[in-house]
Amino acid sequence: MKIRIDIPHHPYDIQIEKGCLAQAGQWLRELWQPQKVVIVTDNHVASLYAEKVKLSLEDAGFQVAVFDFLEGEERKNLTTVQKVYEFLVKQGLTRSDGIVALGGGVVGDLAGFVASTYMRGIHFVQIPTSLTAQVDSSIGGKTGVNTPFAKNMVGTFAQPDGVLIDPLVLETLGKRELIEGMGEVIKYGLIEDPELWALLTELDGSVESILEHAETLIEHSCQVKRKMVVEDELDNGVRLYLNFGHTIGHAIEATAGYGKVMHGEAVAMGMVQISKVAEKKGLMPAGITQSITDMCQKFGLPVDYENWDVDKLYQALTHDKKARGNTLKLVLVPELGSATIHPVSLEEMKDYLVK
């Protein structure tokens, strides 16, 4: 299946197909002329797929080198970026060459940031290998790295030339790594797609059910992301809906120490906490918090953060990228399948951190 991201200045396709990783070279040959390519990946994904993708690209006429770094959110920083820059220089990459981001969200965010800043921007594509990356982070052109202050605090908007999604690679994910991706999938059902929510309701929450329906879950999620990115590429309007659960979620990730709490886990806890307070304030319908909690728990996602520290979380929130002056744009769900922006002051945001 192809999904067109029809952005006027940089349209591209998301290709979703079981087994398509083996045809990565042919796919890239349709996008780029043969040239130098660097595959950026982490050491875990490299051990599984780097050689397979490298050979496919070489068979298509590309000159290929591989850069891998230690896996983990804690490696998504400017230190790693500098190492990639140095590798690109040693490989002699020019502005006519490109980067292939092969991995999960950490790899995609970092590789995209490198591509958008090296020589003021070179071409790149995304080949996401985690569920979170396949349904969310590989699409839409947000790149970035973390700082000690906040998640993704340094970044750019830079669209890839294409996204290649092979649902079969999810079979090599660990259980926790697969399940955390469901945090984003559940979010899509809540903010935009009642049909997706209905499907999630039917599934039994097992790993087997996720893998069996992975292609459908990915397609639904990508369609929601496509709609919002095309309408609001630079994150000033409806694209903000995609941040449901992320305001508190990112704060949890930052205060826990990057890598301790996975992104989808933090999003799940963020959605539950925001909904609980918003429901009490009459801003979300009665019972929705329980529905979200039940759905997250069915798939094995955490709904409560054991190291909850209001002061530390609030400090992290002050660095949120959605902040404008002293106001945060909080995303709420007034009814299933619909989202809205609710501006709150940073001071009022403290209410949403109270258990």
Swiss-Prot record:
Keyword Hydrolase included in the entry's annotation: no
Catalytic activity: 7-phospho-2-dehydro-3-deoxy-D-arabino-heptonate = 3-dehydroquinate + phosphate
Phosphoprotein as UniProt keyword: no
Cofactor note: Binds 1 divalent metal cation per subunit. Can use either Co(2+) or Zn(2+).
Gene Ontology biological process terms in this record: amino acid biosynthetic process; aromatic amino acid family biosynthetic process; chorismate biosynthetic process
Single GO MF descriptor: metal ion binding
CDD domains recorded: DHQS
Subcellular location: Cytoplasm
Principal subcellular localization: cytoplasm
Binding-site list for NAD(+): 71-76, 105-109, 129-130, 142, 151
Enzyme class: lyase
Residues bound to Zn(2+): E184, H246, H263
Task performed by this protein: Catalyzes the conversion of 3-deoxy-D-arabino-heptulosonate 7-phosphate (DAHP) to dehydroquinate (DHQ).
NCBIfam families hit by this protein: aroB
Similarity field: Belongs to the sugar phosphate cyclases superfamily. Dehydroquinate synthase family.
Protein name: 3-dehydroquinate synthase
